Regions:
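GST-like domain detector, emphasizing the conserved glutathione-binding G-site
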Residues: 1-115
Length: 115
């Protein structure tokens, strides 16, 4: 991997009868990407389907960590990153959840941070 990979759920997914759904945390990060379009040049943003298993994520960080949003760190986290949980699976560090990912992106790429 050369760039960090940000996995987000595709919007308008079915989950039973009724209207389609979207993932609120993924929508939040789509907003961050809209506010800071330069992030799309430094991240590999991938949209995955809602149903599990999510094979692409599973192959990298295992079945237990296939929730979205998740950011897979390409070359290990920079030493200056603070107050962000960075678990490791299969030798890969990752960040889970919109707020944690937002804090990581702020520290690493100099964009605004979640309030």
């Amino acid at each position: 991997m050369h760039r960090d990979i940000l996995f987000l759920l595709k919007h308008d997914f079915p989950d039973g009868p009724g209207a389609a759904y979207y993932c609120p945390e993924c929508a939040q990060l789509n907003g961050v990407l809209a506010c800071y379009p330069q992030l799309r040049h430094v991240l590999d943003v991938r949209y995955v389907d809602f149903p599990r298993p999510r094979a692409e994520i599973l192959s990298l960080i295992g079945e237990a960590n296939q929730s979205c949003p998740v950011l897979i760190i390409a070359d290990g986290p920079p030493a200056h990153v603070r107050d962000v949980e960075l678990p490791t699976v299969n030798g890969l560090h990752f960040v889970a959840g919109a707020t944690a990912i937002g804090n990581y992106l702020s520290q690493v790429h100099g964009v605004g941070r979640p309030h």
